[in-house]
Regions:
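Low-complexity, intrinsically disordered/propeptide-like segments
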Residues: 11-16, 53
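Extracytoplasmic c-type cytochrome modules immediately beyond a signal peptide or single-pass transmembrane anchor
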Residues: 19-144, 156-196
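Long, low-complexity, intrinsically disordered N-terminal extensions of eukaryotic proteins, enriched
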Residues: 6, 17-20
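Detector for the c-type heme attachment site
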Residues: 148-155
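Bacterial N-terminal signal peptides
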Residues: 2-13
Length: 196
């Protein structure tokens, strides 16, 4: 089983993972390759959708599409790849995107490393949960200028976007970001058949 998580404003970071667990086990290497591919493909699909909708109808239309279609893309992607997908962020918009304890620790670490200018483009480790081994992979997502219209300082968000946010996400926590902040992460959890 794979859990993939995406956040809006996707950015493919190419920095090598200096703090990632390194291994030569072929099973782990295959899982890591899969996780990277999943992250890139899923992130690229959602990013393309958002940019296309921004060009067609502006940020309000992109937000409407994102709130409805991005989750569908994720579910469809899961069905095709055989994985379970969701989004996580410390400051989430959709309550479905609350991180699990592992993801929360890593997102907090990403925030700290980002402030220290030491954030890598990915993180992975093998963990044991309920007696099973998993590869946990996370790719931080950094706020880009295009993200600010929906995720930036609340007072600068356009009125039509604010209205949609209030209607669809009354408990929205995903505002007041600045360009360069960690918005969330794409996270992939892959079951490993043998114990590590």
């Amino acid at each position: 089983m794979v859990v993939v998580t995406i956040a809006l404003c996707l950015l493919n970071l190419a920095a090598p993972p200096p703090f990632a667990e390194q291994t030569k086990d072929p099973e782990i290497e295959r899982a890591l390759t899969d996780a990277r591919q999943i992250s890139d493909e899923l992130g690229g699909s959602v990013r393309s959708l958002l940019l296309r909708e921004i060009e067609k109808g502006g940020f309000a239309d992109a937000l409407r599409i994102c709130s409805e279609v991005a989750q569908e893309i994720t579910l469809r992607f899961n069905e095709q790849k055989g994985h379970h997908t969701r989004r996580v962020s410390l400051r989430y918009r959709n309550p479905k995107n609350v991180p699990d304890p592992f993801e929360q620790r890593k997102l907090e670490e990403f925030d700290r490393l980002n402030r220290e200018r030491k954030l890598a483009g990915e993180y992975f480790e093998v963990v044991t949960e309920e007696g099973h081994s998993y590869l946990r992979y996370m790719k931080p997502l950094i706020v880009q200028p295009v993200c600010i219209a929906c995720h930036g300082p609340r007072e600068n968000i356009p009125a039509e976007v604010k209205l949609i946010l209030q209607q669809k996400y009354p408990d929205d926590r995903a505002t007041d970001f600045l360009v360069g902040d960690v918005r969330g992460a794409i996270t992939v959890k892959i079951y490993l058949p043998k114990s590590f």
